[in-house]
Regions:
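A glycine/proline-hinged amphipathic helix-loop "lid/cap" segment
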Residues: 1-109, 260-262, 350
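Alpha/beta-hydrolase superfamily serine-hydrolase fold, recognizing
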Residues: 99-350
Length: 350
C-alpha cells in the first residue's frame, strides 16, 4: 500500500468504469517540460508586490513566532463574504460528507449536468484558512474563461483537522461530480498554493482507484512540505509574502495536526506527493511567480513529473506576488494567467 493510502485511508474503489479517453489537442509530449517566462510585471503588479511586502510579510513573520496561538483563521473567509462576485455569477451550496462545497458558474456558463466539462477547485490558504468566498472572484473568472462550472469544497483545516482529512473532503467533492454524471476525462483538478498540494495528492489517490482526470492545474503551488529547500532558496529574499520562519511554523502545525489524527488507531504520516509520483498521472500546468519561494516546488515538480513521463507546462511570471491570480482583474497579468488556464482546461477536456 502506498504512503498516501497509509496517510489518508485505503484507496476507495473506482466509482465507475472509465470510458474511452479522447485524444487531447494540446501539444505536450510525455516527459516533456515546457518552461515559459512571461513578460515583466505591470505597475499594478509592482504596487501589489510592495503592498504584500509591507503588510502581509510582517504579519506572517510575527505570527510565525506563535503559530499555535488561537489565531482567528476563520475571520478571513467570514470577511470575504462581503466581496461581491462578478455580475451574473450563480452560486449553489452543496453538502458533502464532512464539509460543505460551493458550485459556481459564471454568467452564460451552462449548469453542471454531467455533460461537457467541470473543474474541482481546491483553494489555498496554508491548509489553515480561506474558502469559497475568499477565492470567489478567482473561481468565477476561471469558470468564465474555462466555460465550465467549478466545485469548491470547503475542506476541513488544520490545526483542528489533518491534511489527510482535507484530502478525504476533496475526494468526496470528486465523488460528488462523478455521481452527477461526469467522467474522469471531463474533470480538471485545480488549486492554488496549498490547494496545489491537495490537487496532486488527490490525483495520486484517484490513480490508485483507476481514475485519471483530464488535467491538473496549479497556481503558486506548495508541493513539498519539507522546509529547508525553501528557506535556503535564493527567492527567500524577494518573496513578497513569506519570511523563512513561516515555512517552519506551518510545518510544525501540520505535523501536530497529523499526530492528533486517529486513523485506524494510528497517527498520520506526513505525505510528500513529489516522493510518490507514478506514470499515468494527468498532464499538469503550473503558473508561478518568478520571485516567490514556491518557484522551487514548481520546478522540482516539473523535473520529477518528467521522469515518470507526465507532461508538464510551467509558466513563470516575473515580479508577481504569491497566488497573484487572486488579484484579478486588478492586476492585468492575473487576468491573463486565468485566461491561459481557462484555455488549457478547454483543450484538456476537448
Amino acid at each position: 500500500m502506498s504512503a498516501l493510502a497509509t496517510a489518508s485511508g485505503s484507496p476507495r474503489p473506482s466509482l465507475r468504469a472509465p470510458r474511452a479517453r479522447k485524444a487531447r489537442r494540446y501539444p505536450l509530449r510525455a516527459g516533456a517540460v515546457v518552461d515559459v517566462i512571461q513578460d515583466g510585471p505591470s505597475m499594478a503588479a509592482r504596487i501589489a508586490w510592495v503592498s504584500a511586502r509591507l503588510m502581509i510579510r510582517p504579519a506572517l513573520s510575527v505570527g510565525s513566532y506563535l503559530p499555535s496561538a488561537p489565531w482567528p483563521w476563520g475571520v478571513v473567509e467570514f470577511a470575504a463574504r462581503a466581496i461581491t462576485p462578478p455580475p451574473g455569477t450563480v452560486r449553489a451550496g452543496i453538502g458533502l460528507v464532512h464539509c460543505t462545497a460551493q458550485l459556481v458558474r459564471a454568467a452564460a456558463v451552462l449548469p453542471a449536468d454531467g455533460t461537457r466539462r467541470v473543474v474541482l477547485y481546491l483553494h489555498g490558504g496554508a491548509f489553515l484558512t480561506c474558502g469559497a468566498h475568499s477565492h470567489g472572484r478567482l473561481v468565477s473568472m476561471l469558470s468564465s474563461f474555462a466555460d465550465s462550472p467549478v466545485l469548491v469544497p470547503n475542506y476541513r483545516k488544520i490545526p483542528k483537522h489533518s491534511i489527510s482529512d482535507a484530502i478525504d473532503d476533496c475526494y468526496d467533492g470528486y465523488s460528488w461530480l462523478r455521481r452527477k454524471g461526469y467522467e474522469p476525462d471531463q474533470i480538471v483538478l485545480a488549486g492554488d498554493s496549498a490547494g496545489g498540494y491537495l490537487a496532486l495528492a488527490l490525483a495520486q489517490r484517484l490513480l490508485e482507484c483507476g481514475e485519471r482526470p483530464a488535467a491538473l492545474v496549479a497556481m503558486s503551488p506548495l508541493l513539498q512540505l519539507a522546509t529547508r529547500p525553501k528557506t535556503t532558496h535564493p527567492n527567500i529574499g524577494s518573496d513578497a509574502m513569506f519570511p523563512p520562519r513561516a515555512f517552519d511554523a506551518l510545518h510544525g502545525l501540520i505535523a501536530r495536526a497529523a499526530a492528533h489524527r486517529d486513523a485506524d488507531g494510528h497517527s498520520d504520516a506526513l505525505y510528500e506527493p513529489l516522493d510518490h509520483l507514478q506514470p499515468g498521472l494527468p498532464p499538469m500546468l503550473i503558473h508561478v511567480s518568478g520571485c516567490e519561494v514556491l518557484l522551487h516546488d514548481a520546478r522540482l515538480a516539473a523535473q520529477r513529473l518528467a521522469t515518470v513521463s507526465v507532461p508538464v507546462d510551467v509558466q513563470v511570471w516575473p515580479g508577481q506576488m504569491h497566488a497573484f491570480q487572486l488579484a484579478a482583474p486588478m492586476i492585468p497579468e492575473a487576468t491573463r494567467s486565468l485566461r491561459q488556464i481557462g484555455r488549457y482546461i478547454r483543450e484538456a477536456t476537448g
